[in-house]
């Protein structure tokens, strides 16, 4: 069972539809107990970083998400949800994030239209499970004005938009997609199926303990 975190700022319906299309058992929840019992977590997000953190804090979800990350449970952040995984953001004001990944979220300073919206090529920079059966250079769908500045060894895929934008990041059991896999057609669906595989493998490892 994958828990989709409902804190009032996520593109939940599209993610639900994508997971349903590939037979992934899931639930939308803001309950700590259900999140703890889940086998994997998806943290969506659309909007501003400070308001998102305030919403998570109001629902008392910050600690449970941090614990999920630290215990090895697979966690996938999407768009703003990916940004929330990092230590800090400069959006609107300096705000602390979940601190599960090292790095700072900064505003795109590029000679192009902001937000970065539409299809862009994702170039593989490092192998990770979510790349399975996905061709290097596949096109994915973005909508964002901020990006994660983070260590190179975490970056698994980038897109060019005036700068090299980290599109896919990973560290241990924590994964982040700056783009929207649920809006990225068959490529995005395959990536979500790959995350399902990561969750299944982790669940099996827990049963064998």
Swiss-Prot record:
DNA damage is among the record's keywords: no
Residues the record marks as active site: 79 (nucleophile), 180, 182
Pfam families linked to this entry: GATase
A GO MF term: lyase activity
InterPro entries cross-referenced by the UniProt entry: Class_I_gatase-like, GATASE, Imidazole-glycPsynth_HisH
Keyword GTP-binding: no
Domain named Glutamine amidotransferase type-1: residues: 1-205
PROSITE patterns: GATASE_TYPE_1
GO terms for cellular component: cytoplasm
Signal peptide positions (record): none
EC code(s) of this entry: 4.3.2.10, 3.5.1.2
Quaternary data: Heterodimer of HisH and HisF.
Full protein name: Imidazole glycerol phosphate synthase subunit HisH
């Amino acid at each position: 069972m994958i828990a989709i975190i409902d804190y009032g700022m996520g593109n939940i319906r599209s993610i639900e539809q994508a997971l349903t299309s590939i037979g992934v058992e899931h639930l939308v929840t803001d309950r700590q107990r259900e999140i703890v019992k889940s086998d994997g977590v998806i943290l969506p997000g659309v909007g501003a970083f400070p308001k998102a953190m305030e919403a998570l804090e109001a629902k008392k979800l910050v600690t449970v998400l941090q614990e999920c990350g630290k215990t090895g449970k697979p966690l996938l952040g999407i768009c703003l949800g990916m940004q929330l995984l990092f230590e800090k953001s400069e959006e609107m004001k300096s705000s602390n994030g979940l601190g599960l990944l090292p790095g700072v979220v900064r505003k795109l300073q590029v000679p192009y239209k902001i937000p970065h919206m539409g299809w862009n090529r994702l170039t593989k920079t490092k192998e990770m499970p979510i790349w399975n059966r996905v061709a290097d250079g596949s096109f994915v769908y973005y909508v964002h004005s901020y990006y994660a500045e983070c260590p190179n060894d975490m970056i698994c895929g980038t897109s060019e938009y005036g700068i090299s934008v980290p599109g896919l990041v990973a560290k241990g059991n924590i994964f982040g997609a700056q783009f929207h896999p649920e809006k990225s057609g068959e490529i995005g669906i395959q990536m979500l199926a790959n995350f399902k595989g990561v969750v299944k493998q982790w669940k099996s490892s827990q049963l064998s303990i």
